[in-house]
Each structure stands twice: as C-alpha cells, then as structure tokens.
Amino acid sequence: MVAALVVVPVDGAAGQSRPAAVEQPTPTATASPTPTPTPTPTATATPSPTPTPTPTPTPTATPTPAPEVPEADSEEPEEPAPGVSAVVPTGPRLGGNSRFGRAVLASRAAFPDGATTVIVANGDATVGPVLAASLAADRSAPLLFVRADGISSTVRTELMRLAPKTIVAFGTDADFDRGGIDALAAIAPVERIMFSSRPQASRLALDSRSEPVDTVYLSGSDLRSHALAISLAGTTSGAALLVNGKGSSVASLTLEALQRTGATSIVVVGGTSEVSSAYADGLEAAGFAVSRRSHSDPLEFSLQLARLAPDAPEAFYAVNPDVVWDVALGAALSAATGQPMVFTLYQCMFSRTSDHIEAQGSRVIGVGKISWLRTAVDDNTACRDEKPRLQASLLSALKQTASKYDGTFSFTVIELGRLQERTALRGSTRLDPASMMKLVAAYAALKRIQDGTSTWNTKPRSTTLRTCLRVMIHASDNHCHDDIVAWLGSARLTRIAQSLGMSNTFYGSLPASGSILYAGNRSTTNDLAAFVRKLERGELLSPKYTRILRDYMHSQIFRTRIASGIPPGVYQASKPGALWISSGLLQGDTAIVRGPQTSFVISIIATGGVPKSALSALARTAYTHFFGSFGSAASYPLQQMRSTRSTPMRSSPGGAVVGTLPGGRNVEVTTASRVWYKIRYGSQVVWVDSRALRNR
C-alpha cells in the first residue's frame, strides 16, 4: 500500500511533497519501563517536576515547484470522513506496563468499533504526544504511540483491528523514519504531517477541524496547561490552541487560524507567565472576547477546569501530571469522550477533586501504570483518608524490620512530595547523634561564607574552610569538626540549630583536650530528618550553597548504611555516624533519597550494638513502601578511593615518609585528620594526602 506523504512547511516557507526523512532521529527524552525525572529530575523533587523537553529540530523546506502527482492519485482529495464516535471506557483503569501498551488499551476501550482515522505519535518523544492529542481530539480519533523506525506487534494488531482509512503520522522530521512510515503504510494510507515548533503543530491540529466552534481555549507552551485546554475543549465543544504567548503581539498566522474556527470567545488557560497580559490584549484588539483561567497549583487548576463541564460527567480521567505520555492519553480520551480530565497525586485522589467526583456521582478512570498512579485513585480515595493509612503501613513495616535485630531503634521518615507522609518511632528521643552533628557545623560555616562574613580561605585553626568542610563530610573528619566548633562556639552552634527548628539539638562543651564528639551532644531523628528536608527543599541556603553541602553528602565514602539499602543508581545524599557509648556501638545515618515518583528523607539512630546492615534494611523497607519492591540493593567497594598520582605514604598525618603509593591504586580509607587520610593499602596502614585520591 502506497503511503500518501505530506510535508508541512516551516512557517513562512513553501513546502514540498517528498518521502519521509530517513536520517536517524535526533535523541529525545525517553522514559524507562519504570519512569525516573530526571529526574528532569526534575523530576516536585516536591514531586520530582516534569523534565523540560528537548526543543524539536527545525526541518529546512526548500521552495520547489509542486511535484507531479501519481496518476493513481490524480482525483480530487475527498473531505475527511467523519470519525467513529468514541465511548467512555467501562473499566476503572487503563494501565499496562508501557506507554505504548497503555495507548493500545485506551484505543480498545474507547474505540471498540474501530476508527476512520488513527493518530500516531513518537512515543519516545516528550512534546509530540501532547500536541498529537489535540489532533486526535479534533479528528475524533484514537492516539497510538510508535517508535521512529517501526511499530510493535501489539500496535500493529490494534491498527488492524481499528481498520482506519487513514493513519496520520504527526511529529517532527526526526520522529518517523522510512521504516516507520512503511510499517504504517502496510496497514493503511499514511498522511504525514510534520511541524517544526509547538505553536505550528497546534495550528495544524486546529486547522484539521471540520466544524466551527464558539470558543477556543488558548494555552502557552506548557504542555500540562495545553492538555487541560484540550480536555476542556472536549467537554464544552470548543477547540484548543497552543501559542507562544510570552510576547506582546499575536502572530498573523495565529490570528488567521483563530478566525478560521469561527470562534468569538477565547479563554486563556494559564497564568501571565505563559500567556502575557499584552498578548491577551492583542487578542481583544482583534475582536475576540477574552477571559482567563489560571491557578498556580496544577491539581487545583485541573479541578477548576473540570468544574466547567456543563453536565454531570459519567467519569473523570485521572492522570499523574508528571507523566507526559499519560497526560497526552488522558487529554485525547477526555476530548474524544467528552469526560473531564483531572490531575492527582500518584498515591491517592486529590481530596478536593475526590469530593467533587463524589458529589457528581461519577466514577474514576485511572490512566497510568500502577507505580505512577496507585489503585486508591481508581477508588476515588481522598488523600486525607489515604495518608493516615499509608503512614500506619510504613510504621508497621519499619517496626517489623527493626524487630529482626537486637538493640533499640529511633527513626523518622518524611516524604517530600505533595502528600508529605511522615512516620517515626522514638523520633523525639534525645540521643547522641555521633558524626551526624557535623551537618549543623557545616551549615553554619557555609552560611557565613554565603553571607560574606567568612571566606573559603578562612582558617578556623590550621586548615582552610575549603578543606575542612570537604573532609568533615567526605571522610567524617573529627579534627575539622573540632576546629569549627572551637571557632564558632558550641553555644552559638546550639542557637543556630534551634533557630532552624531543631529544638532538641544542642552541642556539649568542647573539652580542653579531646573531641567535641564525646562532649554529650544531643539531637533526635525528628530534628535531623527535618534538617535534611529543609536542605533538599532549598530552605537553608542559597541554591549554590545548598548544592555544595548536598554534593558533600552525596560523595561521602562511608556508604554501608542507608546508601546500601536502596537500588543501584538511585540518588542519595547522606551523613552517617558511629560512636562507642556505654551500651555498645551506636550506629546512625541521615539521608535524602530521590526516587522515581517522589523523594524522602530518613534518619536512624540505633543503639545496643546494632549492625550497619540493620540501617540498610530499614532504608530498603522505606524505599519499598514508596516505590515498590526491587532486587539487589546498591553495593560499594571496601576500597572506596583510588590514587590519582604517585604520592608519599607517611607514618602519621604529615609524618615521616615510609613509602610511595603509586597512581591508579585502590585503597580503603578508615579515618581522617584534616587533609590527611588514613588508608589500608595491601598490608600497610599509612597516611596520605587526600588530594591525591578520588572516589571510585
């Protein structure tokens, strides 16, 4: 079957019909089977926020005479056939293990009798799917995701079932190659629509409408706002358009597209940061009645727009706004079936939205993978009801893990996302924090550098803050900690800690000889968890100095506690500690952990000779609660560092040379004395300059 290929020119340039591009696709952001933000992350942390999509490439169109049309296609093109009406899916969930499979499930559920037209978008891209949702809405067509070079057997089977007269491949020049187009053309004629920018893509979708509308819902370049505009257009018989609304004037191409719809009213969907007041004024000057709907909270905003549906909906599509492909599918389904779409947390239904759905007598259709949208959403369980249950479940699981070990545990876990789950056991019990107390000293010194009252070259005693701050966290050096406490004073550091809300944290008095570590310092896991929570949220220091302290914690070398209880590759920033007390060896650790859907902080202090592996087990339990079970946890080499060059080995810090450590050798660091690290190298235990070592 020969594909009908259409190239849409860049704005202002003539176009030409030609085969689809065969060059390799430009890399775009992708999601693994279990999505991760990026991480962009992203990536809200707050839930990890949606990563900023990579701008799409601009294909160059060379003006040429119109090509000859093959004889077999010489007749006048027919008007697009009306689409088959979509139905509201009967089930509570459109899940599946991948976005490709999820789109197929949505197609089967909403278009059981087939479809005249099918819209396909590159499912490895992050921008095209949402823009394609608008086209699917305007053509009353299902939306499927494919890869640039071909289609899976599942998608092929669904296309055969739908039996479309036309498949529309909607994307940039790089979104489809020759193999992908040929695979589609083997099923039905392909209409290839290419675009070079978000506004252009949206105008093309708008122009595909065959019926006039009274109202156009206009959004800026934010994809979530555009998806909400698509949904609102579907429930109110309007149309949606995405524009570059940051400027002060409206492009002529945009005005022409709006005028072709026959609309007299425009509703701006989003704040002035997306569509400026000057831009809205330009629309009014062109003769449109302009109003605006906006809210800084995407969950509240989606509810606000869903309330505009004229009738009590049969169902609400619920999606996680952090998963762009589910946002696209939700918008397409919403518009096709005339049912509103709402955004919600991944753990439960946003409480105010739950109340509205309950009042309407409607049901929920969850669109998303279970790990990114839990079943409590399908049940319309309000977060106010789900949060206590989740907190109790986490506490029970942590207690069960702790019960496997002798000793006494104190711990606090706080989720940093929207729900802010929190649980603790003996979280307010004052205990010796061991080396975790160094976080307070590091903060106090960095705050002075940030404020300009000290510099990186300031020497509390014999070593600069540049060196002291690094080794105090990286290798848990006690000497630099003592130096900073002597410099600032234990009473002042206590006041600083308590000014941060650490009401149960205080330093003892620095002895004339000996370390502050044994001076009777006290803190709680509640205080320590609250400290790193504020650090991660940027509430303690400027972004620059927040990053510096967090990087120290991320790169510290004693990672056999919390860091060894989470999956490989998961970001953690931690500060462990250990101290001999009367009941035996105290073990502690406090960490920030960033998972795929949210982040959490955890602080643990265990007494009575508890092994480090117990802290790893508690971290694993917490991680599993938030993100699901996983296989082997991360492991770190006993020899944490590697020499970068030949360096003298010494009998003591700065002492006599007893040999040479060659470059490129792995070594185990056991302790530190300011710039000097004590290492095990083979059978030798010696001291070397830490600047000759790097993390493995």
Residue ranges and their predicted role:
Residues 76-386:
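Extracellular glycan-binding segments that recognize GlcNAc-based cell-wall polysaccharides
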Residues 384-429, 621, 625:
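Beta-lactamase-like hydrolase cores
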Residues 560-616, 620-627:
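Short, Gly/Ser/Thr-enriched beta-strand-loop segments that form substrate-interacting elements
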Residues 140-145, 340, 447-466, 542-543:
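Short, well-structured active-site flanking segments
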Residues 660-691:
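SH3/SH3-like beta-barrel superfamily modules
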Residues 131, 135, 430-456, 472, ...:
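Active-site SXXK
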Residues 628-636, 680-696:
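Boundary regions of SH3-family modules and the immediately adjacent low-complexity/disordered segments
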Residues 408, 481-540:
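Mid-domain, small-residue-enriched loop/turn segments at the edges of structured enzyme/sensor domains
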